[in-house]
């Protein structure tokens, strides 16, 4: 997981990624999630990203093996923009549950840990 902060984070990412972050002239709002690619100078895919817009920051979820080159590749294009990229991989993790029994498994995890399911869900469109 990579974090992009700064007052020009959305403008910067909008220029660098394949997905439009300002569809219809309006920036994506907090908790919006889109998929995108980061392309290298030859137009080849360097990273397949999930872009999660939050208040004051944007999280880029990518393959762990692509994190370093994505940070250095995108960082090389930050010249005068107010944007900072850092790798949060050592402090954040993601678990995805898919399929018809996903909610049952999540209930079991919650019962074992005592953590409410609602606190585990980050995406507003997630179904519990």
What are these regions (language model features)?
Residues 1-128:
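Basic, glycine/lysine-rich polyanion-binding surfaces/domains
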């Amino acid at each position: 997981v990579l974090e992009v902060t700064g007052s020009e984070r959305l403008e910067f990412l909008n220029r660098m990624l394949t997905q439009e972050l300002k569809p219809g002239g309006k920036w994506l709002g907090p908790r919006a999630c889109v998929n995108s690619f980061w392309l290298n100078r030859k137009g080849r895919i360097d990273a397949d990203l999930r872009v999660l817009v939050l208040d004051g920051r944007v999280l880029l979820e990518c393959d762990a093996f692509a994190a370093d080159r994505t940070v250095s590749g995108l960082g090389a294009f930050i010249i005068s923009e107010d944007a900072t990229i850092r790798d949060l991989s050592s402090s954040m993790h993601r678990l995805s549950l898919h399929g018809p029994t996903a909610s049952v498994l999540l209930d079991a995890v919650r019962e074992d840990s005592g953590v409410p399911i609602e606190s585990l869900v980050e995406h507003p469109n997630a179904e519990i």
